[in-house]
């Protein structure tokens, strides 16, 4: 059963969904169950995928990887998400953008998640 804020991907068409309200049935796309994208469960290099959380004046700066992640046409970060105080904040990226996002929020505990088009879903907590 899908749970709140889990991310799922269709292995056929590539549709990706984030669960806003978990119901009682599995998610299906193209006639088959969608794959749950578990954070950090692929073979991507950790130093290029695990979000780095930095508390800065006015909010949080999230950088993807301790070594900057490529942002090329065939390999890029699709989005960066910050979870804090029961809220979700998302910045969508495209090839050529910097693999980082600033979120102007005041929270003491946050979780940062990102999605790489080749290596899936990754997260870090402060």
Swiss-Prot record:
<dbReference type="GO" id="GO:0019430">
    <property type="term" value="P:removal of superoxide radicals"/>
</dbReference>
<keyword id="KW-0249">Electron transport</keyword>
<feature type="binding site">
    <location>
        <position position="116"/>
    </location>
    <ligand>
        <name>Fe cation 2</name>
    </ligand>
</feature>
<feature type="binding site">
    <location>
        <position position="29"/>
    </location>
    <ligand>
        <name>Fe cation 1</name>
    </ligand>
</feature>
<keyword id="KW-0813">Transport</keyword>
<feature type="binding site">
    <location>
        <position position="30"/>
    </location>
    <ligand>
        <name>Fe cation 1</name>
    </ligand>
</feature>
<dbReference type="InterPro" id="IPR051233">
    <property type="entry name" value="Desulfoferrodoxin_SOR"/>
</dbReference>
<comment type="subunit">
    <text>Homodimer.</text>
</comment>
<keyword id="KW-0408">Iron</keyword>
<feature type="binding site">
    <location>
        <position position="75"/>
    </location>
    <ligand>
        <name>Fe cation 2</name>
    </ligand>
</feature>
<keyword id="KW-0560">Oxidoreductase</keyword>
<comment type="similarity">
    <text>Belongs to the desulfoferrodoxin family.</text>
</comment>
<feature type="binding site">
    <location>
        <position position="10"/>
    </location>
    <ligand>
        <name>Fe cation 1</name>
    </ligand>
</feature>
<dbReference type="InterPro" id="IPR038094">
    <property type="entry name" value="Desulfoferrodoxin_N_sf"/>
</dbReference>
<dbReference type="InterPro" id="IPR002742">
    <property type="entry name" value="Desulfoferrodoxin_Fe-bd_dom"/>
</dbReference>
<dbReference type="Pfam" id="PF01880">
    <property type="entry name" value="Desulfoferrodox"/>
</dbReference>
<keyword id="KW-0216">Detoxification</keyword>
<dbReference type="InterPro" id="IPR004462">
    <property type="entry name" value="Desulfoferrodoxin_N"/>
</dbReference>
<dbReference type="InterPro" id="IPR036073">
    <property type="entry name" value="Desulfoferrodoxin_Fe-bd_dom_sf"/>
</dbReference>
<comment type="function">
    <text>Catalyzes the one-electron reduction of superoxide anion radical to hydrogen peroxide at a nonheme ferrous iron center. Plays a fundamental role in case of oxidative stress via its superoxide detoxification activity.</text>
</comment>
<feature type="binding site">
    <location>
        <position position="13"/>
    </location>
    <ligand>
        <name>Fe cation 1</name>
    </ligand>
</feature>
<protein>
    <recommendedName>
        <fullName>Desulfoferrodoxin</fullName>
        <ecNumber>1.15.1.2</ecNumber>
    </recommendedName>
</protein>
<dbReference type="Pfam" id="PF06397">
    <property type="entry name" value="Desulfoferrod_N"/>
</dbReference>
<feature type="binding site">
    <location>
        <position position="119"/>
    </location>
    <ligand>
        <name>Fe cation 2</name>
    </ligand>
</feature>
<dbReference type="GO" id="GO:0050605">
    <property type="term" value="F:superoxide reductase activity"/>
</dbReference>
<keyword id="KW-0479">Metal-binding</keyword>
<dbReference type="InterPro" id="IPR004793">
    <property type="entry name" value="Desulfoferrodoxin_rbo"/>
</dbReference>
<feature type="binding site">
    <location>
        <position position="69"/>
    </location>
    <ligand>
        <name>Fe cation 2</name>
    </ligand>
</feature>
<feature type="binding site">
    <location>
        <position position="49"/>
    </location>
    <ligand>
        <name>Fe cation 2</name>
    </ligand>
</feature>
<dbReference type="GO" id="GO:0005506">
    <property type="term" value="F:iron ion binding"/>
</dbReference>
């Amino acid at each position: 059963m899908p749970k709140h804020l889990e991310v799922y991907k269709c292995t056929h068409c590539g549709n990706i969904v984030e669960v806003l309200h978990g119901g009682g049935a599995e998610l299906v796309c193209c006639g088959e169950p969608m794959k749950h994208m578990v954070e950090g469960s692929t073979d991507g290099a950790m130093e290029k995928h695990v979000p780095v959380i930095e508390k800065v004046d006015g909010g949080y700066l999230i950088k993807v990887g301790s070594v900057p992640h490529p942002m090329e046409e065939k390999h890029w970060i699709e989005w960066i998400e910050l979870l804090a105080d029961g809220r979700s904040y998302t910045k969508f990226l495209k090839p050529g953008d910097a693999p980082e996002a600033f979120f102007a929020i005041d929270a003491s505990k946050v979780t940062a998640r990102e999605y790489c088009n080749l290596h899936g879903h990754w997260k870090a907590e402060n």
